Regions:
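Phosphate-handling architecture centered on phosphoinositide signaling
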Residues: 1-175
């Protein structure tokens, strides 16, 4: 897909520490995907992996209303102040897990929010972690599905996707 899909913002959020906004980035790194040696490996890897897809209204991610009920969670959840970890910024979504060696075929309605603290700020981390939240408000109160295999835990209140920014400090290169 293009790095500037129609109808999506070209900038994410606003910086709190510096002026400006973070440039939006929707694509895989072209230096990797266009490399003749890496491209076939990437394509095969994508076919071999299970796919977790989540869907929500575009406005749930990118609305510019700075309001916990209607604001876009990808661009407005802001830094953690006190106990502010994005709980009021959960949006309805649908998640689907398909394919992979396990032959997954699962769909569930859920809540979607950004995961983390300062990693939610666009100037600190250009791509964010998400959290799928299973509450009766959005669908079933829990996800009961053997994501990790038959002999592993299979009941979840939430799943964190792309968790990073743990013991690191990742910033854009501002050169």
């Amino acid at each position: 897909p293009p790095n500037n899909p129609e109808g999506y913002p070209t900038e994410w959020g606003k910086f709190t520490d510096i002026q400006g906004k973070a440039p939006a980035d929707y694509e895989m790194d072209p230096e990797m995907t266009h490399d003749e040696e890496l491209r076939p490996k990437i394509m095969q890897g994508l076919r071999d992996l299970p796919i977790l897809s989540w869907v929500t209204d575009k406005e749930n991610l990118f609305s510019h209303e700075n309001d916990t009920a209607r604001g876009g969670i990808y661009i407005l959840t802001g830094p953690p102040v006190g106990d502010a970890t994005g709980h009021g910024w959960t949006r309805p979504a649908s998640a689907e897990l398909i394919g992979g060696p396990q032959g997954h075929d699962m769909q569930i309605d859920c809540g979607l929010r950004l995961h983390g603290g300062h990693g939610r700020l666009a100037e600190k981390n250009p791509k964010h972690s998400f959290r799928l939240v299973f509450k009766k408000e959005y669908g079933p109160g829990t996800l009961e599905y053997p994501i990790y295999g038959e002999n592993e835990p299979a009941k979840f209140n939430q799943l964190v996707l792309r968790c990073h920014f743990g013991n690191t400090w990742q910033h854009w290169g501002w050169a």
